[in-house]
Amino acid sequence: MTQTPTNPRERLIVALDVPDVAQASKLVATLDDSVLFYKIGYQLAYAGGLSMAQDLIGAGKKVFIDLKLHDIGNTVASGVASIAKLGATFLTVHAYPQTMKAAVEASRGTGLKILAVTVLTSYDEADLKEAGYSLGVADLVAQRARQAQAIGIDGLVCSAEEAANLRAIVGEGLSLVTPGIRPAGSAVGDQKRVMTPARAIAAGADYLVVGRPIVAATDPKSAANAIVAEIAVAH
């Protein structure tokens, strides 16, 4: 069974969605001890971000590598093994059975936790229909969540809109990691299924991934602290 961190600051994951290590390092220095957990995605990973991940881990931070792996089993397993050596806490894979099975098996005994991406938070019903899916967002997310749990995945990446339903489906056995978090008054951007921090926690999210509302803020540290404060009082 997974355990939700008792320290609200450990439940905030800041997405380092910047183009290079120099900007990311500057942001991390600005945020200082207000943030303990960072996410590194495609943009930064391919610009030196994986080396930076090692530095962050060495400095006592936690790192979530968001590469959404999806390939043949051997290739996924090799990628998982490489990421595990970095000392990362989380790694994402797409929620396809063969991909999840390979990732879970490769992560055994490493300390790396595998998160399955159910449906991207930038997708809505129309997007799924255009891509050829017959199921709607809620049904597809539920189907993939059940498959992920049966395979032994550690957690799910889902929008806050699906969190309550997923918690009912998977119980307390999986961590729910929720992107698309926007404090009241923030721009939605390219996300289509968004929610405030307090509402996301109330819906059952264990971790909140926040990018632009902190990264693009005039005062990133104050923005991060405000979200942590909101997490602390949410129920």
Swiss-Prot record:
In this protein, the active site sits at K68
Biological processes annotated in GO: 'de novo' pyrimidine nucleobase biosynthetic process; 'de novo' UMP biosynthetic process
Q: Which residues bind substrate?
A: 17, 39, 66-75, 121, 182, 191, 211-212
Keyword vocabulary terms for this entry: Decarboxylase, Lyase, Pyrimidine biosynthesis
Q: Can you tell which superkingdom this protein's organism belongs to?
A: Bacteria
Q: Which CDD domains match?
A: OMP_decarboxylase_like (cd04725)
Reactions accelerated catalytically: orotidine 5'-phosphate + H(+) = UMP + CO2
Task: Provide GO CC annotations from the record.
Answer: cytosol
The catalytic activity of this protein is classed by the Enzyme Commission as: 4.1.1.23
One of the entry's Gene Ontology molecular-function terms is: orotidine-5'-phosphate decarboxylase activity
Pathway(s) it belongs to = Pyrimidine metabolism; UMP biosynthesis via de novo pathway; UMP from orotate: step 2/2
Explain the purpose of this protein: Catalyzes the decarboxylation of orotidine 5'-monophosphate (OMP) to uridine 5'-monophosphate (UMP).
Family assignment from sequence similarity = Belongs to the OMP decarboxylase family. Type 1 subfamily.
The UniProt subunit note reads as follows: Homodimer.
Q: What is this protein called?
A: Orotidine 5'-phosphate decarboxylase
Which species is listed as the source?
Answer: Afipia carboxidovorans (strain ATCC 49405 / DSM 1227 / KCTC 32145 / OM5)
Q: What is the lineage of its organism?
A: Bacteria, Pseudomonadati, Pseudomonadota, Alphaproteobacteria, Hyphomicrobiales
